[in-house]
């Protein structure tokens, strides 16, 4: 127990280290259980994405979003997994306006906007034993600002999140879910913090080298609470395929189901587990 306590203290310390991230164009990814399932100790993945009909709330525009340098990495020590990830560069092509921009947002010079982020760091702690029929995990972390309010792709504000998740496997089928709270900063001086529901549900069918999966994930403004600009409800359905075990390729088709999520998109990446 003392050893687990030391790991937990280390995880909390690492989670509180400032690490760059932006705000809310895309929802938080679902937790990847492979390291806690014993498939390895270290994991890394890099890729990119194309998303159509994406809204940039602060700029008041809708268009095509390109994500260059999507990445994530994770390291396991005992029951604890340390996660880091983000997007090196986002390039947005304005196509139509749906609202007036926020006062500090500058007009685009050539129909394009680009900015860094988001980046994030998180800690996941397994709460159950390895033989438990349903595994449980506590996940918490932060996304800190690197974005420029003048660009208008995301708000320059700090976010924190914490979720409780579970996973059950029967044969080749695994189902996982997590839900919790996102405590997000805002651009509204009269309402400086916004609390949203953060959630993800995923099902996958492991047939060896090929693993098809479907994921539903997003964030939801509470009932009876108005949406604050830059903190809107987000939701995506992702139908994907992972090919390979130790080294793998992943491709996902994205369909948004809220006003501020993409109409359609594609995410591709390559990674390795060791």
Locate each region found by the language model.
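N-terminal secretory signal peptides that target proteins for export/translocation
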Residues: 1-5
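Bacterial N-terminal signal peptides
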Residues: 7-18
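Transmembrane beta-barrel domains of Gram-negative outer membranes and organellar outer membranes
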Residues: 23-177, 181-184, 194-239, 246-252, ...
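Acidic, metal/ion-handling microdomains and their immediate structural contexts
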Residues: 191
């Amino acid at each position: 127990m003392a050893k687990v306590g030391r790991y937990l203290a280390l995880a909390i310390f690492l989670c509180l280290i400032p690490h760059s991230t932006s705000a809310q164009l895309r929802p938080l990814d679902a937790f990847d259980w492979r390291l806690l399932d014993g498939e390895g100790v270290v994991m890394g993945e890099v890729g990119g994405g194309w998303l159509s009909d994406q809204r940039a709330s602060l700029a008041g525009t809708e268009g095509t979003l390109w994500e260059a340098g999507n990445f994530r990495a994770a390291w396991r020590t005992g029951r604890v997994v340390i996660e880091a990830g983000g997007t090196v560069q986002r390039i947005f092509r304005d196509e139509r306006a749906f609202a007036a921009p926020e006062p500090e947002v500058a007009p685009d010079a050539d129909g394009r906007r680009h900015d860094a982020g988001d980046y994030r760091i998180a800690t996941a702690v397994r709460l159950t034993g390895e033989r438990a029929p349903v595994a449980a995990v506590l996940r918490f972390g932060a996304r800190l600002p690197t974005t420029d309010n003048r660009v208008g792709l995301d708000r320059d504000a700090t976010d924190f999140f914490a979720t409780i998740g579970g996973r059950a496997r029967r044969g080749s089928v695994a189902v996982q879910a997590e839900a919790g709270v996102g405590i997000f900063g805002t651009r509204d001086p009269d309402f400086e913090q916004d609390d949203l529901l953060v959630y993800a549900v995923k099902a996958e069918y492991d047939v060896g080298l090929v693993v098809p999966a479907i994921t539903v994930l997003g964030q939801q403004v509470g009932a009876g609470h108005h949406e604050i600009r830059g903190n809107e409800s987000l939701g995506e359905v992702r139908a994907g395929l992972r090919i390979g075990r130790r080294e793998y390729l992943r491709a996902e088709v994205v369909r948004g189901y809220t006003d501020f999520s993409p109409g359609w998109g594609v995410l591709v990446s390559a990674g390795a587990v060791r």
